Amino acid sequence: MTSLQIRKLTYAALYLAIALVLPFVTGQIPEIGSMLSPMHIPVLLCGFMCGWPWGLAVGLIAPLLRSVLFGMPALIPSAVAMAFELAVYGAMSGLLYAILPRKPWITYAVLVISMIAGRIVWGIARVILAGMTGSSFTWALFISGAVTNAIPGIILHLVLIPVLVMAMERAGLSLNKPKTAAR
């Protein structure tokens, strides 16, 4: 393993640990704790800072591991659907951030695209899981889960994540280097 690979592995492990612990902090606010989507923050940051493979891996593992270790979220359907959603968050944020120019507005665009793609995948996963378990997942449940109940988390992510990404870039902590065109 190269030094860069070891650093990415270390950063990814840190983001995974934060994803496991952060829900305990927001869970202390019963009214909006889960609506803040605390596990999403370190997964998105991992994608931005470490690249798409690490963001995908942390996103896929975090909800499943948290479910097994702490019983929350429930494994089926929540943790499984979240695993697909967060894997897309981490992969999209890492991939788009590497190929697009590094400008502040691009960070917001990457974040919004990643969030939309992740929510769509979450909805698809929930529909498939509902079919497998014999339950139902309606359009109203999708809108409620992906948009209405998620508004506090969406706002938090749009405010916090770009600021953290820009600060970490300035501090030289990003390991997700821009892809340059072949000459």
Predicted regions and their residues:
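Alpha-helical transmembrane segments and their cytosolic interface
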Residues: 1-16, 104, 137-183
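Short helix-perturbing small/polar motifs within transmembrane alpha-helices
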Residues: 7-21, 58, 79-127, 165
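Interfacial aromatic-anchored transmembrane helix boundaries in multi-pass membrane proteins
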Residues: 21-36, 61-96, 130, 140
